[in-house]
Amino acid sequence: MEHSAGKTLVWALFFTVVLGGMAMAKDAAQMGVIVVDIQGDFTKLKNGSLAVDGTDEAYIKATEENTKKLKEAGYPIFATQDWHPKNHASFFTNHKGKKAFDVIKLHGKDQVLWPSHCVQKTPGADILLDKKLFKAVVKKGMDAQYDSYSGFQDDGGKKTDMDKLLKKDKINKVVVYGIATDYCVRATALDAVAAGYKVIMIKNLSRGVAPDTSQKAMDEMKAKGIVILDNLDLEKIKGN
């Protein structure tokens, strides 16, 4: 009898461990991470042409360390990368008589004119985090006529590979952070919600161009059901 009870206990423990592990693996497989535009031209660290405040060495280090934590927890990590041709329509230098941050109409929409940034195959376009962290890097902004703040599509509606990659991994929830809160993080998070994903945005792993527009962007995200966490907290992420 004791032998039989012992075997029963062993099997119970076995199934608890195995099934519990499978459940954890399933949870990990259903959540992905999108790290938005951690590139030289957007950072103070590299004296980028479009550097955002707060993007110093400490920020890059913290972002890399937290991304490693997520990878070690079993979550697939995807990066977005601005990847513009030299003649991109969003560069003020490609519009005679225009200055940086002027606003023009482009294809019927307001277009902010930016300093030249993240030009293909230049150091400013390089991702500053360890490339081995990423399962895939999704390039955006390659069409010279359309800007692409979102990691899912450009302003003309042309899709990137992001949605396809996430669906291939059966992901239904994404954690989003990076540069900039009020532009590419915002657009990527909102498009993720529109595509049917649950979204969590990490505030302290993101940096915005301006405090007022960053707050407005976060308010907009919250209104769409996006959960905003101040810090990366694996337990809170699993619970949302």
Give the label of every model feature segment.
Residues A23-G141, K168, N172, V193-I200, ...:
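Active-site acidic carboxylates
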Residues I171-A187, M201-S206:
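Glycine-rich anion-binding loop/nest that anchors nucleotide
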Residues G6, G20-G21:
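Residue-identity detector for glycine
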Residues G156-M162, D182-A195:
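Short, composition-biased local secondary-structure segments
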Residues S90-F91, S148-G151, A187, D212:
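Short, well-ordered secondary-structure micro-motifs
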Residues K131-L166:
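Histidine/lysine/aspartate-rich catalytic loop segments that bind and position anionic ligands
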Residues W11-G20:
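Bacterial N-terminal signal peptides
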Residues M1-W11:
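Bacterial N-terminal signal peptides that target proteins for export
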